[in-house]
Amino acid sequence: MRISASTVLLGAASAASAASFQNQAQQVLADNFHKAHDAIKPVADSFAHTTLESFEEAFNGMNSQAKALWDEIKLLVPESAFDKPTWFSKPKAAKRRKDWDHVVKGADVQKLWVKGADGEKHREVGGQLDNFNLRVKSVDPSKLGVDKVKQYSGYLDDEANDKHLFYWFFESRNDPKNDPVVLWLNGGPGCSSLTGLFLELGPSSIDKKLKVINNEYAWNNNASVIFLDQPVNVGYSYSGNAVSNTVAAGKDVYALLTLFFHQFPEYAKQDFHIAGESYAGHYIPVFASEILSHKDRNINLKSVLIGNGLTDPLTQYEHYRPMACGEGGYPAVLSESECRSMDNALPRCQSLIRNCYESGSVWSCVPAAIYCNNQFIGPYQRTGQNVYDIRGKCEDDNNLCYSALGWISDYLNQKDVMDALGVEVESYDSCNFDINRNFLFQGDWMQPFHRLVPGILKEIPVLIYAGDADFICNWLGNKAWSEALEWPGKKGFNKAELEDLSLPEADKEYGKVKSSGNFTFMQIYQAGHMVPMDQPENSLDFLNRWLGGEWFEQ
C-alpha cells in the first residue's frame, strides 16, 4: 500500500517514505494545519450536493467516537474548505490513437447466445458489457526487448463513463497453449501494476541506465501474465472521471477479462488465476466475487493469491504494535513508550473499525482510517525505517524508498516505449496519490472485504502469502486474519500445522506453509512487502507449485 505524505497525515496506510514524512514536518494529525486542510477538503466536496436532512441523518447515525474524531478534524479546517466543490483527482491529458490491430465491442459480445445442455438458449457471457470496448495492439518484442514472447497491449474503454484501462499481456515462455493465465494487480490504491512487472515478477527489470535486464525468475516462465493498470488514472490508464471504491473497479476488471478472452479464445480455455499484493487484498476478494457471480462466463477462474495484503483491518491493525516492537521475528523499531502508546490506542481504533464494519458509512469508515493509521503507522514512519521492509532504512524518499521505481518511471515515460505499446497518455507515474486519497475519503480503506472470502472458498482455493520483513501489511496480521476468518473449514485450518517450505532441490527452507480445505497461508522468510523482488527464485517456486494444485483441496 502506498500514499503521499499529505495523505499519511490523515492516516492512509500505504505509506510514503519516512524521510519525506520527516522532512515535511508531518507529525500526527494536529501538527500540520495546511496538510490537514488539503486532505480533508475532498470529504467536504463529496457531500456538496447532499441535502441537509440526509447530511444530519448520516452524522447522527455515527457512534460517539466517530463523532468525536470528526470534531477533531473540524477544528483543523476553516469553513472556507466547504465553500466550493472541486474534484481532486485530476484527469490525465490523453490523445486517442487509431492504429489498433483488434477492437472488440462489448455490445457485439452481449448479443451472443448459445444453447445450453438443457436445450435452452442463454447469453454466452453475463454482465453489462454494452458500454465497453477492448482495443488490442500486437507488441513487437524486438522493439523493447522486454521479452521474446508474444505480447499484447491496449485499453479497455468504458465509453459511457470515459474510462480507459491499460493492460500489457505476456505469453508464457514455456507452453502457452496449455499453461495457465495470471492477472497481476499491484495495490496502492493508485499504484501501477507495471511496477510489479519491472520491479518484481515480470520478464525484465530496468537498471539505473534505463536498460532492460532479463529476469530468469519471471512469473511468465510457466504462465501467461496480464499486468493491468487499474483503477483509471493509474499508470497508463486514464479518465475524465474517477473510480473511488473497490466495488466499482471490479466491474471494469470483469469486462476487460471477458472481452480479452473473447478475442483470444486460445487463452480462455486455460486455467485462470488472480494474484496481487498490498491493497489488492481489497481488490481480489471483490474481483473474484464479481467473476464468480456470473454463471455464464468465459473466465476459467481457478484460484486467487494475495501477497502481503490488507483484507481484514480489524484483525490486522492489532498486529502493527507487535511487528514494530520486536515480536515479529526482527528487532524492535519503536521504543517501549511508543509501544505502550500503541497499546493504549488500540481499543479506540478497534471500536472505530467495528463501527465502520457495521455501518459501511463514509462517516464511520473515514475516521477509523484517519485515527488508526496515525496511531499505528505514523510512529513507525517517523523513525525513518522502511515501512515495506523492517530490515533497513528508507533509502529514497522520492520513490517510496526504492530508487528503482524512479528508473521504471523514467523508462516508461520514454516516447519510443509509449509508441511501442500504443499508450495514449502524455506521462506515466508509478503511483497516483490523488486516487489513494480518493479511496480513503470514500471510506473504502477500512471496509471488511474479508467477508467475501468464505464465499470464494466454496468455489476456488485461496492463498494468502506474506513476506515476514514487511511492516505495512505484515505477516502477523495476515496470519491472524486467515485464522480468525469465519467459514466452515475454520477449525481444520487452525488445527493444521505450519510445515517447512523449501525448494525441491535445496535443503534450506525459505518459509512455512499451512493448508486446509482450499485455504492456504504462507510465511516467506527474508522478504518484505514485495516478495517476488526479495525472493525471486522462491516466489517462482511456490507460484508454480500453487498453479500446479499442490495445496488445492482434492
Curated annotation (Swiss-Prot):
EC number of the protein: 3.4.16.5
Family to which this protein belongs: Belongs to the peptidase S10 family.
Localization in the cell: Vacuole
Entry keyword set: Carboxypeptidase, Disulfide bond, Glycoprotein, Hydrolase, Protease, Signal, Vacuole, Zymogen
InterPro entries found in the cross-reference section: AB_hydrolase_fold, Peptidase_S10, Propeptide_carboxypepY, Ser_caboxypep_ser_AS
Propeptide residues per the UniProt entry: 18-137
Enzyme class: hydrolase
Protein name as catalogued: Carboxypeptidase Y homolog A
Signal peptide as annotated in the record: 1-17
Cellular component, GO annotation: fungal-type vacuole
UniProt-listed PANTHER family: SERINE CARBOXYPEPTIDASE CTSA-4.1, SERINE PROTEASE FAMILY S10 SERINE CARBOXYPEPTIDASE
GO biological process, one term: proteolysis
Active-site residue numbers: S278, D470, H529
Catalysed transformations (reactions): Release of a C-terminal amino acid with broad specificity
Main location: other
Organism: Sordaria macrospora (strain ATCC MYA-333 / DSM 997 / K(L3346) / K-hell)
Function, in words: Vacuolar carboxypeptidase involved in degradation of small peptides. Digests preferentially peptides containing an aliphatic or hydrophobic residue in P1' position, as well as methionine, leucine or phenylalanine in P1 position of ester substrate.
Glycosylation sites: N222, N518
Record-level Gene Ontology MF annotations: serine-type carboxypeptidase activity
Disulfide bond entries: C191-C431, C325-C339, C349-C372, C356-C365, C394-C401
Keyword Cell division: no
